[in-house]
Amino acid sequence: MKILGIDPGTKNCGYAILEKSKFKTILLEAGLIKIKPNTLQYQITELCEGLDLIFKNHKFDEVAIEDIFFAYNPKTVLKLAQFRGALSLKILQLHGDFAEYTPLQVKKTVTGKAKADKEQVAFMVKKILGINKEIKPLDITDAIAIALTHANNLRIN
C-alpha cells in the first residue's frame, strides 16, 4: 500500500511517500514543494503544480494531510487556511478522499507524547523507519510522521 503524507505550509510543503506492507514500512521518497515569495495566487499555483507532479509520478492508495494548527497571528492562520483549502481541492481532484490528522494526533502516534517538539518527532521518525542519516528540513519529517500516523491508523482500523 502506498501512502502520501503532506505537511502543508506557506513557505514549504513537505511530502512523504511510504510503502506499507503487512510486516514493514519503507520510505520511498520525501521532499518539499518549495513556495517562492510572491502573491498568494502564484504561491497557491506553485503548490498545486508541485502536487500535480507528485501525483503524475506516483499512484497512491491513501493520502493523509495535517490539519491546521492554532496560531496566534490571524494573518498566518488565514493564509494557511487558503493554502490548505487549495491543497484539499487539488487532492480531491487528483485522488479523492483523504485523511486528516491534527498535530497532536501525529505527535502522540509517533512519539507517544502529544506535546512532543519537532526534534522529538524527527528522532522517532528516523528510529521507526531505521534511517541513520539526518532528514532536513523538519517539514519533511513532519510529512513522514503524518504518513506513519495514517499507516498506524489503517492498521488499527
Swiss-Prot record:
Mg(2+) 2 binds at residue 66. One of its GO terms (cellular component) is Holliday junction resolvase complex. One of its GO terms (molecular function) is crossover junction DNA endonuclease activity. It is found in: Cytoplasm. It catalyses: Endonucleolytic cleavage at a junction such as a reciprocal single-stranded crossover between two homologous DNA duplexes (Holliday junction). It comes from the Bacteria. The active site is at residues 7, 66, 139. Gene3D superfamilies: Ribonuclease H-like superfamily/Ribonuclease H. GO terms for biological process: DNA recombination; DNA repair. InterPro entries: RNaseH-like_sf, RNaseH_sf, X-over_junc_endoDNase_Mg_BS, X-over_junc_endoDNase_RuvC. Its EC number is 3.1.21.10. NCBIfam families: ruvC. The RuvA-RuvB-RuvC complex processes Holliday junction (HJ) DNA during genetic recombination and DNA repair. Endonuclease that resolves HJ intermediates. Cleaves cruciform DNA by making single-stranded nicks across the HJ at symmetrical positions within the homologous arms, yielding a 5'-phosphate and a 3'-hydroxyl group; requires a central core of homology in the junction. The consensus cleavage sequence is 5'-(A/T)TT(C/G)-3'. Cleavage occurs on the 3'-side of the TT dinucleotide at the point of strand exchange. Belongs to the RuvC family. This is Crossover junction endodeoxyribonuclease RuvC.
